[in-house]
Regions:
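Hydrophobic, secondary-structure "cap" segments at the distal end of domains
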Residues: 146-156
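Glycine- (often His-adjacent) and acidic-residue-rich active-site loop
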Residues: 53-90, 107, 221
């Protein structure tokens, strides 16, 4: 299964499970992720969620090999993938249970960055890296990152990250408020598990109410802004520049965008 879910001791352990593809997101993974989040929502035993990625990287974003294989059907596939990613990230925010995410390696693209931004607490390994990259391949940010990233780091930092596409270190991510804390790589799993266990021991209703109050107090509803983001991504997904950007990634070359 591309996503694994196990609930015990009040903690729902949700794991992206495509390590051979750096947990790159395709429609199958995104559908399964959304279904898993809905299962967590329906299970009162899940008081806290611990989100992780199997292997060296948390999530490398979209699965570019799958995208290339779609050929002329790529725009439709990207629209479908974006829709499922939007559903998954929105469902994480809407969960009553707080979401703790542990990041190792790369959290990239709308998938990786979107999941980080939809989490409540994020623990990063010291060597972790964060990267958007959408503009570099002729696309707009997705996964809710145009909404939630701005809420987390502010307008100026969000524009810098999304327009200039820097690769942020874990320490840089901590300084701007993208992650909650940074720990040594070999302590990441244990620390994230401990944090989740500590939260699971607290009153579930108080955790849920606090999460709801914070997320609902950040201005225009996430749902409204996600809808606008999805529309923009859909418009760009079939453009020549978007297709050229993807081909350039596959062929490991500099893209030749139209001017």
């Amino acid at each position: 299964m591309p996503v694994a879910l196990e609930i015990s001791d009040g903690v729902a352990r949700l794991r992206l499970n495509r390590p051979e593809a750096s947990n790159g997101m395709n429609v199958e993974l995104l559908k399964t992720l959304h279904e898993a989040v809905l299962a967590i929502h329906a299970d009162p035993a899940a008081r806290v969620v611990l989100l992780t990625g199997e292997g060296r990287n948390f999530c490398a974003g979209g699965d570019v090999k799958t995208f290339e294989a779609k050929g002329e059907k790529l725009p439709d596939y990207l629209r479908e993938a974006t829709a499922w990613l939007q559903l998954a990230t929105a469902a994480l925010i809407q969960l009553k249970a707080p979401v703790v995410t542990a990041v190792q390696g790369f959290a990239a693209g709308g998938g990786g960055l979107g999941l980080v931004c939809s989490s409540d607490l994020v623990v990063a390994g010291r060597s972790a890296k964060f990267f958007s990259g959408a503009v570099r391949v002729g696309m707009a940010p997705d996964g809710g990152s145009s909404v939630t990233l701005t809420q987390l780091v502010g307008l100026r930092q969000a524009l810098r990250i999304l327009l200039t596409n820097p690769t942020l270190t874990a320490e840089e991510a901590l300084q701007i408020g993208l992650v909650t804390e940074v720990v040594d790589d070999d302590e990441l799993t244990e620390h994230a598990e401990s944090l989740a266990a500590d939260l699971a021991a607290l009153p579930a209703d108080a955790l849920s109410a606090t999460k709801r109050l914070v997320w609902s107090g950040v201005g225009q509803s996430v749902e409204q802004r996600l809808a606008e983001e999805a529309r923009t991504v859909s418009e760009l997904s079939g453009t020549p520049d978007a297709l050229e950007g993807l081909r350039a990634v596959i062929e490991r070359r500099v893209p030749r965008f139209s001017r």
